[in-house]
């Protein structure tokens, strides 16, 4: 439980930024598109943590959450007995697809270099690969990532907002 409480400030910050972004998108305030693009970029960048080694001073040793971005600790390695190298290769591939998808979706959000019509497909594809990557390394610390992916799926599938048809549907 203590570990989950450590996520509260980050989760609260993400919720606040998301609410402000939603407000701006709902009222067709131009900055809303840029805020959403920023959220997509940030979410994509977090996935790059899978290429960095776990910090020396592990939070798990102090009673906190274990470093969640370690592909070598994947349940496929520890429980299913798959080779860590294969799992790492799959994970890095998913990470690169996720990162590229979110970067392209962010560009499509603001209509720079990527057609706005591609936005929904890019967001759905990036969230699908993100979710697959998060499932590889299931951890309570990654619940926020699952939540962000779910919110993005709802945003696209419920046709709540799109750079092609802004503002939010009422």
Task: Label the model's feature ranges.
Residues 2-170:
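Membrane-interface extramembranous regions
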């Amino acid at each position: 439980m203590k570990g989950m409480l450590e996520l509260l400030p980050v989760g609260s910050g993400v919720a606040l930024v998301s609410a402000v972004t939603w407000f701006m998108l709902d009222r067709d305030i131009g900055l809303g598109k840029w805020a959403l693009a920023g959220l997509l970029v940030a979410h994509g960048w977090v996935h790059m943590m899978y290429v960095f080694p776990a910090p020396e001073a592990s939070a798990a040793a102090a009673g906190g959450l274990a470093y969640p971005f370690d592909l070598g600790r994947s349940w496929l390695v520890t429980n299913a007995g798959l080779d860590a190298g294969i799992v790492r290769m799959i994970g890095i591939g998913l990470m690169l697809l996720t990162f590229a998808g979110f970067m392209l979706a962010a560009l499509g959000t603001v209509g720079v270099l990527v057609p706005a019509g591609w936005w929904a497909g890019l967001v759905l594809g990036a969230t699908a690969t993100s979710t697959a990557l998060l499932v590889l390394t299931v951890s309570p610390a990654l619940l926020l990532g699952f939540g962000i992916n779910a919110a993005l799926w709802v945003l696209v599938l419920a046709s709540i907002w799109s750079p092609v048809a802004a503002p939010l549907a009422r």
